[in-house]
C-alpha cells in the first residue's frame, strides 16, 4: 500500500529493461532530428551535459542560474504570506528584499513568466507535432458541434452514443446473412448433384462385390486364398470410394446405408459457415467446391473479415472499459476497508488545495489490470463454453472444453462440429462473445507488451512518438493528451480535471525522489525550530497534492 | 546500481540515455549530479528553471568532476556494429524463442501421437481381418446377409475416417506414422498462427490436453513476435518521420499484400499439380487471413513444407502490418463515435488557438483547455505548481552572500524516508 499512500507512484519499467537501456550506446540515426527540435521536451533529456571552456564562463553560468532560483523563492514566500499572514521570520524577509534589490523586480517577474511559458508550451508542441491537419472548417464544425451538444437532452446523448455501435452490429449481421444466402444458392444444387453421383458410384461397386461373392458361392469353390484375394480387392475399391465421398463431399455413414442424400448446405449451415469465415475460425466442414463459390468466398472474406473484426474489437473495447471500471471500484472498496487501520497516518491537505475541492479522502490510484485476472476470465469463459456444449451435444466436458478453446483462439480444426439446428444461434452468440472477450484481453494486456518489446533498445524519434506509461498502458503522449481532453469534456467535475492535470504533469517534470517530503526548503530553516523533530511531524508537513510545505498546526484534516 | 539510478532509468526509459550518463550512474553520483547532465545549453534560460546552482567551492569541484568525466568518455565512443547488435539482440532472441518453441512442440507431438497412431492402425487392421473371416464363414448365406456385412464394413470405414485414418492406413499393415517431424512442425505452425487446417490433428486425450496448454502459451508468443516484426516493416515504410499517415500508405500496404498473395498463388500453381490458379489464390487467401479451411493444403517434401511455413509467416507479417496501418485507426474512430468529443477536432482546435495564447502571453495548460473546451467559463482551475529540486544536503550548502554566517549553522537535520 505504499504506492497508494503516495498517490502518484509511477509504474516504472523492469529493472532489467532499465539496465539494458542504460547500456545502450552510440550511433543514433535520428540524432540530427533530435537536435533540430530544440523546443521539443524530449531533447531536454538528450543533452550530454554542460561543457565550460574556462572558469570565467563557469562563473557567468552560475550567475545566470540565479535568475530561476529567485523567482521560485519569491513566489513561494508571497504565497506563504497570503496564506499564513505575517508569521514569516524577519530575517527571511530581509533576505528576499536583498535579492530583489540585487536583481530587480523585472528580472524576477520575467523569469517566472518565461519558466511558466516554457512548461506549458511543451505539451502543446507535442500535440502540434502529432501531425493533424490544420483546417479552418474543422474549427467551425467544432463550434457548431458544441452549440448542438448544449441543447441535447440526456436521452438524445445516450441515443447518439449507442446508435452508431448498434448500426455497426446490424450491418455485420446483415452482411453475414446475405453472404450465407449466396453461398446457399450457389453450393446447394451442386452439392446435391455431386452427392447423388457419389452414392451411385458407391452402390455400383457394392453390387459388383455382392455379385462376385454370390457367383463364387454358386460355384462351390472352397479355396480360401481365392476368397480372400477377391474380398480384399473389392474392399480396397470400396474403401477408396468411401474415403473420397467422406473427405470431399462430406457424406456420412447413414447416408450411404440409406442411399439417400441429405442437405449439407442448408440455410442454417450456410449462416454457420459464413460466421466461421468472417471470424477466421474456418472449420472447413463444409467448404465451397465450385469456382463461383470460391470466388465469392474470396470477395466475402476480404470485405467481411475487416468489418467483423472491427465490430468485435468495438465490443471488446466496451468490455475492457467496463472491466477497468469494475476493477477501479474494487480498488476503492479495498482502500476503504484498509484505510480504517491507517487513520493515524492519513495525509493532510493544505488550505490552498482544500479550497479547490481536493479533500484528504480523495484517492488516486493507477488502475492496472493484472494479467492473471484477464487470463482467468478467458479460462473461465472457455470452461463455461465447455459446460454449455456438453449439455447441447453428446460430448464429454473435456471434449467440449477442447472445442471451445480451439474456437476461441480461432484455430478451428473442424474435427468437432456442433449440430446446426435449433441450438445453433446460442452457439453463434457464444462464439461472438468469446471473440469479444479475447479482443478485450489483447486490448488490456497484449498491446502494452507489444509496444514495450518493439521499442526495446531503441531511441524515440521525436515527441510525436514519445511514450508515456499511464495506468499500466504504454500510450503515445499525443493520444494521452487527446484522451485527457475527452475525459475533461465528458466529466464536468472540477476535481477530475485538476487530478488528471496533476497526474499528467507529473510525467513531464524531471526526477523527483521518493523522500521529497522529508527534504526541506532552504527558506524553511526558521520553521524547523518551532516544529518537533519527530519523523511523523516531518511526514505530515507536506500536502499530498501540490507537495508544498506548511506548518503543522494549520493543517486541515 | 545506485537506488536513485533505478528511478532515473525507469523514468527515462522512453528517452535517450548517453554513455556519459551511464558512466556517471555506475559511479554512484548523487541525484544532483545526474540532473546536472540533463540540463540544456546555457543559452536557454527556460531549461534552467528546475535547477538551483550554487556558486561555492563545492559546486565548482562537482562541475570539474563532471567535465573530467565528459572529456574521458568522449575519447572512446562505441559505434556501428556493437550498437546495432545490441539493438537487434532482443528481437533476435524473441524470434529464436518462437522457432525453438515450435520445434520443441513438434517433437513432443510426435512423441505423444506416434504410438497412439500405430495402435490405432493395428486395431483397425485387426477389425479388418476379422471382417474377412466373417465374410468367408458366411459363404453360403443369402444376398441380404452379405449386404448387411457390407453395411457393417461401411460403418467401420467411416469411423476410421473420422479418426484421421485413410484406407491405406488400415487395409495394409503400416510401420510408420503420419506424424513425422516435418508434418508436426507444419501442424504446430498452423496452431500457433491460429490457421488450423485440421488435416492432421491430435486424436488421443494426451495429445489434446497438450495442445490446449501448448496453444495457451504459444499463441501469444507467436502473435507478439509477428507484431514486433510487422512494426519493423512499418518503420521501414515511414521515410519521413514527420510525414502524416495518409490514405496512400494504407492502399500501398493493401496492394502489397494482394500482390504477395498473387505471386505466391502463381508459385503454388506451378508446384502443385492438381491446383489451378484460382485454387492456389484461394488457398493463399484462406491461409493468410487465418481462416484455414484445410480442404487445400500443401503436401510434399521437407524443403517444400519448410518453404510453405516461411510463406505463411511472411504473409502473416504483411497481414498484421495492414491491420496495424489501417485497422487501428478505424477501430479507434469507430469506438469514439458518439463520445463527447472527437479527438481530431480537439487537437485541431488547440492548434488553431495556440497562436492566440502566445499573443496574449497566457499560455498554460488550464487556459488552453478552458478556451478549447468552452465549458469552464468563469471558473479558475487550480494552477499546477512547478517546484525546483532541492538536494538532501541543501541546508549545509551556504549561499555566496552567507559565507560570513557559516559558523552559525551548527544545527543538524533529520531525514526520514516515508
Swiss-Prot record, chain A:
InterPro entries for this protein: 2pore_dom_K_chnl, 2pore_dom_K_chnl_TASK, K_chnl_dom
Annotated coiled-coil segments of the chain: none
GO CC terms of this entry: plasma membrane
GO molecular-function terms, A-Z: outward rectifier potassium channel activity; potassium ion leak channel activity
Protein name as annotated: TWiK family of potassium channels protein 7
UniProt keyword list: Glycoprotein, Ion channel, Ion transport, Membrane, Potassium, Potassium channel, Potassium transport, Transmembrane, Transmembrane helix, Transport
Intramembrane segments: 270-290, 397-417
Amino acid at each position: 500500500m505504499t504506492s497508494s499512500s503516495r498517490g502518484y507512484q509511477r509504474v516504472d519499467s523492469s529493472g532489467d529493461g532499465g539496465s539494458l537501456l542504460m547500456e545502450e550506446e552510440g550511433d543514433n540515426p535520428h540524432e540530427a532530428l533530435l537536435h533540430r527540435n530544440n523546443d521539443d521536451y524530449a531533447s531536454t533529456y538528450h543533452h550530454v551535459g554542460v561543457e565550460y571552456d574556462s572558469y570565467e564562463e563557469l562563473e557567468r553560468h552560475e550567475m545566470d542560474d540565479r535568475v530561476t532560483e529567485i523567482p521560485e523563492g519569491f513566489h513561494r514566500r508571497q504565497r506563504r504570506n497570503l496564506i499564513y499572514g505575517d508569521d514569516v521570520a524577519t530575517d527571511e524577509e530581509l533576505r528576499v528584499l536583498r535579492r530583489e534589490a540585487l536583481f530587480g523586480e523585472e528580472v524576477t517577474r520575467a523569469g517566472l513568466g518565461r519558466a511558466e511559458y516554457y512548461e506549458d508550451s511543451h505539451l502543446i508542441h507535442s500535440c502540434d507535432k502529432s501531425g493533424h491537419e490544420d483546417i479552418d472548417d474543422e474549427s467551425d464544425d467544432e463550434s457548431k458541434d458544441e452549440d448542438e451538444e448544449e441543447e441535447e437532452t440526456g436521452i438524445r446523448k445516450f441515443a447518439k452514443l449507442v446508435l452508431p455501435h448498434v448500426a455497426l452490429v446490424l450491418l455485420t449481421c446483415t452482411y453475414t446473412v446475405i453472404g450465407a444466402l449466396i453461398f446457399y444458392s450457389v453450393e446447394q444444387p451442386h452439392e446435391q448433384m455431386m452427392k447423388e453421383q457419389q452414392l451411385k458410384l458407391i452402390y455400383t461397386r457394392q453390387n459388383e462385390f455382392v455379385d462376385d461373392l454370390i457367383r463364387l458361392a454358386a460355384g462351390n469353390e472352397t479355396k480360401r486364398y481365392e476368397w480372400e484375394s477377391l474380398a480384399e480387392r473389392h474392399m480396397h475399391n470400396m474403401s477408396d470410394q468411401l474415403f473420397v465421398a467422406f473427405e470431399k463431399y462430406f457424406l456420412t455413414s447413414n447416408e450411404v446405408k440409406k442411399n439417400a442424400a441429405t442437405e449439407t448446405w442448408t440455410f442454417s449451415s450456410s449462416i454457420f459457415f459464413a460466421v466461421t469465415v468472417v471470424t477466421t475460425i474456418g472449420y472447413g466442414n463444409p467448404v465451397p467446391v465450385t469456382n463461383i463459390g470460391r470466388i465469392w468466398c474470396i470477395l466475402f472474406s476480404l470485405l467481411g473479415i475487416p468489418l467483423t473484426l472491427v465490430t468485435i474489437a468495438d465490443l471488446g473495447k466496451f468490455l475492457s472499459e467496463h472491466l477497468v471500471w469494475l476493477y477501479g471500484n474494487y480498488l476503492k472498496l479495498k482502500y476503504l476497508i484498509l484505510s480504517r487501520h491507517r487513520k493515524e497516518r492519513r495525509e493532510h491537505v493544505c488550505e490552498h488545495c482544500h479550497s479547490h475541492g481536493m479533500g484528504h479522502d480523495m484517492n488516486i490510484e493507477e488502475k492496472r489490470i493484472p494479467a492473471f485476472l484477464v487470463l482467468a476470465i478467458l479460462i473461465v469463459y472457455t470452461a463455461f463454453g465447455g459446460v454449455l456444449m456438453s449439455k447441447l451435444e453428446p460430448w464429454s466436458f473435456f471434449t467440449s472444453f477442447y472445442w471451445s478453446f480451439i474456437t476461441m483462439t480461432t484455430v478451428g480444426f473442424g474435427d468437432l462440429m456442433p449440430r446446426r439446428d435449433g441450438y445453433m444461434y446460442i452457439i453463434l452468440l457464444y462464439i461472438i462473445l468469446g471473440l469479444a472477450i479475447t479482443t478485450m484481453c489483447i486490448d488490456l494486456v497484449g498491446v502494452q507488451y507489444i509496444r514495450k518489446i518493439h521499442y526495446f533498445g531503441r531511441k524515440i524519434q521525436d515527441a510525436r512518438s514519445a511514450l508515456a506509461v499511464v495506468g499500466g498502458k504504454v500510450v503515445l503522449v499525443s493520444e494521452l493528451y487527446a484522451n485527457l481532453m475527452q475525459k475533461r469534456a465528458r466529466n464536468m467535475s472540477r476535481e477530475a480535471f485538476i487530478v488528471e492535470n496533476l497526474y499528467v504533469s507529473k510525467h513531464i517534470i524531471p526526477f523527483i525522489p521518493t523522500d521529497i517530503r522529508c527534504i526541506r526548503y532552504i527558506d524553511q530553516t526558521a520553521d524547523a525550530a518551532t516544529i518537533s523533530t519527530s519523523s511523523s511531524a516531518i511526514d505530515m508537513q507536506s500536502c499530498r497534492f501540490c507537495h508544498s510545505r506548511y506548518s503543522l498546526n494549520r493543517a486541515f484534516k | 546500481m545506485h537506488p536513485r539510478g533505478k528511478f532515473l532509468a525507469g523514468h527515462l526509459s522512453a528517452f535517450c540515455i548517453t554513455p556519459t550518463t551511464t558512466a556517471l550512474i555506475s559511479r554512484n553520483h548523487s541525484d544532483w549530479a545526474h540532473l546536472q547532465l540533463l540540463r540544456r545549453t546555457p543559452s536557454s534560460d527556460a531549461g534552467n528553471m528546475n535547477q538551483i546552482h550554487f556558486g561555492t567551492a563545492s559546486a565548482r569541484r562537482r562541475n570539474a568532476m563532471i567535465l573530467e568525466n565528459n572529456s574521458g568518455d568522449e575519447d572512446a565512443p562505441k559505434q556501428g556494429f556493437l550498437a546495432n547488435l545490441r539493438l537487434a539482440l532482443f528481437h533476435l532472441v524473441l524470434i529464436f524463442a518462437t522457432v525453438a518453441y515450435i520445434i520443441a512442440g513438434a517433437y513432443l507431438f510426435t512423441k505423444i501421437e506416434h504410438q497412439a497412431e500405430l495402435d490405432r492402425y493395428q486395431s483397425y487392421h485387426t477389425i479388418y481381418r476379422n471382417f474377412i473371416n466373417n465374410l468367408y464363414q458366411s459363404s453360403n448365406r443369402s444376398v441380404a446377409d452379405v449386404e448387411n456385412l457390407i453395411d457393417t464394413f461401411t460403418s467401420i470405414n467411416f469411423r476410421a475416417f473420422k479418426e484421421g485414418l485413410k484406407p491405406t492406413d488400415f487395409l495394409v499393415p503400416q510401420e510408420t506414422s503420419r506424424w513425422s517431424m516435418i508434418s508436426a512442425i507444419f501442424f504446430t505452425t498452423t496452431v500457433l498462427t491460429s490457421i488450423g487446417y485440421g488435416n492432421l490433428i491430435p486424436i488421443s486425450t494426451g495429445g489434446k490436453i497438450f495442445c490446449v496448454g501448448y496453444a495457451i502459451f504459444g499463441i501469444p508468443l507467436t502473435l507478439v513476435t509477428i507484431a514486433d516484426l510487422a512494426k519493423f516493416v512499418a518503420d521501414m515504410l515511414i521515410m519521413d518521420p514527420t510525414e502524416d499517415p495518409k490514405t496512400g500508405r494504407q492502399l500501398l500496404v493493401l496492394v502489397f499484400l494482394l500482390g504477395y498473395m498473387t505471386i505466391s498463388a502463381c508459385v503454388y500453381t506451378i508446384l502443385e499439380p492438381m491446383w489451378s490458379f484460382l485454387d492456389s489464390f484461394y488457398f493463399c487467401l484462406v491461409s493468410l487471413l487465418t481462416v484455414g479451411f484445410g480442404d487445400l493444403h500443401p503436401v510434399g517434401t521437407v524443403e517444400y513444407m519448410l518453404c510453405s511455413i516461411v510463406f505463411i509467416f511472411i504473409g502473416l507479417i504483411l497481414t498484421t502490418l495492414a491491420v496495424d496501418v489501417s485497422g487501428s485507426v478505424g477501430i479507434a474512430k469507430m469506438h469514439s463515435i458518439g463520445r463527447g468529443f472527437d479527438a481530431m477536432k480537439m487537437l485541431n482546435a488547440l492548434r488553431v488557438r495556440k497562436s492566440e495564447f502566445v499573443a496574449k502571453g497566457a499560455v498554460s495548460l488550464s487556459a488552453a483547455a478552458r478556451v478549447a473546451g468552452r465549458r469552464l467559463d468563469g471558473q479558475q482551475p487550480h494552477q499546477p505548481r512547478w517546484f525546483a529540486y532541492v538536494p538532501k544536503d541543501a541546508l549545509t550548502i551556504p549561499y555566496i552572500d552567507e559565507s560570513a554566517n557559516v559558523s552559525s549553522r551548527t544545527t543538524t537535520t533529520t531525514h526520514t524516508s516515508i
